[in-house]
Regions:
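Charge-dense, helix-prone N-terminal extensions
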Residues: 1-105
Length: 105
């Protein structure tokens, strides 16, 4: 399944004007990197992948509709899968903010 171009466009618009953001096709989706660090992606499996502080992941899963991201049956610490909805801007900002806090690559 290809990523949802409408979601990708919404992400693109939310991150517009940030010169540190780069788009990169990967794993059937479209990733948005901040200073070379993945922040958020329009997933090839639908919805959104969001990078968060690994210490906050469990709390976010418990308090939101986010689910842990799994790759090959393993949960990926610091990554959440989210269905795109009205809260998309908050999730994109959460991913952008965390990726911005990491050292540039």
């Amino acid at each position: 399944m290809a990523y949802d171009e409408a979601i990708a466009q919404q992400i693109r618009e939310l991150l517009a004007g940030d010169a540190t953001v780069e788009e990169k096709k990967m794993f059937g989706g479209l990733g948005f990197l901040v200073n070379g660090n993945m922040a958020v992606a329009a997933s090839g499996q639908g919805g959104l992948l969001v990078r968060v502080d690994p210490t906050e992941g469990e709390k976010l899963v418990a308090s939101t509709k986010a689910e842990p991201m799994e790759m090959r049956g393993r949960q990926m610490a610091g990554w959440l899968r989210v269905e795109a909805g009205d809260d998309l801007p908050e999730w994109v900002e959460r991913g952008r903010s965390y990726a911005s806090s990491l050292p540039p690559k």
